[in-house]
Amino acid sequence: LNLFTVVEIGDHHVTILDGDRFEPLWRFPSRIALHGGAKYSPDGRFVYLASRDGWVGKYDLYGLRPVAEARVAVNTRNIAVSSDGRYLIAGNVLPPTLAILDAGDLSVLKVIAVKGDKDAASRVSAVYDAAPRRSFIVALRDIPEIWEISYQDNPRPVPAGLIRNHEEGLKEGAFDRGPFPVRRIRLEESIDDFFFDPSYANLIGASRDGGRGQVVNLDVGRKIAEVALPGMPHLGSGITFEYEGRLVLATPHLKEGAVSIVDMKDWRTIKRIATAG
């Protein structure tokens, strides 16, 4: 299929466009304040849409019909679909939770309260699928943490607190054994939006208030570098490409007309390109 999903502003409708002829195939009413980030099943047959007021809908692009709908929150930030097409996760602002749904019928499988060490709640900033890791990656707005949530059938147990022995059969301490165990990565500053490198080993994140980005290695679970990115980079719209034999990241900025080019080997900003807006 060669289709576009167009979320219309103002009249609460969605249009499915033929990508070859740019002609509407199906126009249907949607919930109000629909999020523009449509997500798709791996085979491209189904599109998932979330509204700001917590409704998640599933639509069949073969039959051009709605399939299922569920409400997951009062205020939802965004959604992600697992790489195997089995699960959908919704990151919520109110209540501060993560809702994991069966992507088939949108039934709720697990609701995770988003809390820190002292039970302080946090809104969700963003959630994305990390396909090679078979996990969801979540950024928290009010607590400086990144969460990795595995959706594998037999996930590796995640330590909860101090562990004396990791040897199989002799493990001591508390473990989150799943399903959907939460691995917490603690940072110095919270992250509002982020971007993966092609290997999905590194996450590049930025906050709304800061003039710099953080590079977090998901394998070792800590920040490994900082990137000078003033002007509030919009990393969700970033891309990577090869330039003069090296891998670089290009990211636009929200507060000024500029695009920053970052060398992904040493994380230096090698060029700043002014734009018209």
Identify the residue ranges that each predicted region occupies.
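Predominantly soluble domains enriched in secretory-pathway, periplasmic, or organellar proteins
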Residues: 1-277
